[in-house]
Swiss-Prot record:
The gene is aroE. It comes from Alteromonas mediterranea (strain DSM 17117 / CIP 110805 / LMG 28347 / Deep ecotype). This is Shikimate dehydrogenase (NADP(+)). It catalyses: shikimate + NADP(+) = 3-dehydroshikimate + NADPH + H(+). NADP(+) binds at residues 127-131, 151-156, 215, 239. Pathway: Metabolic intermediate biosynthesis; chorismate biosynthesis; chorismate from D-erythrose 4-phosphate and phosphoenolpyruvate: step 4/7.
Length: 279
């Protein structure tokens, strides 16, 4: 049996074991997948101990350990290099620990699965944290014409843009986003968790907007999605599909088997809705 895990702090609410078990059942893999709560200063030791076990193939890494995982691993994956963050670790054939970042691929695949065209579109990315860093190179690889980063602290956005080192990436102050007139707006901040808006949706920022994407997911549309819909944006998407798609990419890296995610996204959404009703 192949062993996997997800490390985080907190980790109790993680859907990763459920999602990966669905993948395994679908493709005929026998796996175990556990949630591991690592101490904030003890991730490296905990991950090494898990990955040294017989049968251990790899693990996922969530907040706040993605930078620790990046520093721990041998990283050839461009998205992980750009993000300076790793969310997927795998034992290599030569005893080395390999690191990947599947967040951006997860976002791009979810957008494409939802019928969103990325090629030649102008993208506005709200936020400049780890979630934002991980999606920049995959969005550009998917053909985005430009990608503009807006953040409450403009200097942080400039730092992320500089690290991306691509002429298609630029920065705008959060209060000046109306000058961008993007086709796609992506919220990578946690604003929606507290029912706040990540940015103002007034002053013309939506004049050409076709899609808003919120990396947060709930059992109902976030305020960001609702407000955009009321202001005429045709398509609003939450981050649940991204969660499933980034997991599918990790599963493929580990097993070389690519699961069909369409039914799984629906099943996971049902679980989220039932869980939130109970709470």
């Amino acid at each position: 049996m192949k062993k996997f895990a997800v490390f985080g702090n907190p980790i109790a609410q993680s859907l990763s074991p459920t999602i990966h078990q669905m993948f395994a059942d679908q493709v005929g893999e026998k796996i175990s997948y556990e949630k591991i709560l690592a101490p904030e200063d003890g991730f490296v030791e905990a991950a090494k101990a898990f990955l040294a076990q017989e049968g251990a193939v790899g693990c996922n890494v969530t907040m706040p350990f993605k930078l620790d995982a990046f520093n721990l691993a041998k990283v050839d994956d461009q998205a992980a290099k750009d993000a300076q963050a790793v969310n997927t670790l795998m034992n290599g054939d030569r005893g080395e620990l390999l690191g990947f970042n599947t967040d951006g691929v997860g976002l791009v695949n979810d957008l494409l699965n939802s019928g969103v065209k990325i090629k030649d579109k102008h993208v506005l990315l709200i936020g400049a944290g780890g979630a934002a860093r991980g999606v920049i190179s995959p969005l550009l690889k998917a053909g985005a014409a430009t990608l503009t980063i807006a953040n409450r602290t403009k200097a942080k956005a400039e730092e992320v843009a500089s690290a991306a080192s691509n002429p298609k990436v630029d920065v705008v102050a959060l209060e000046d986003i109306a000058t961008i007139a993007p086709h796609i707006i992506i919220n990578s901040t946690a604003a929606s968790l507290s029912n706040a808006l990540p940015c103002s949706l007034n002053d013309g920022v939506l004049q050409h907007c076709e899609v808003v994407y919120d990396m947060v997911y709930k059992n109902s549309p976030t305020r960001f999605m609702r407000d955009a819909a009321e202001l005429g944006v045709k398509t609003q998407i939450d981050g649940l599909g991204m969660l499933v798609e980034q997991a599918a990419e990790a599963f493929y890296i580990w097993t070389q088997k690519r699961p069909d995610t369409s039914d799984i996204v629906k099943r996971v959404r049902d679980i989220v809705e039932q869980s939130e009703k109970r709470n």
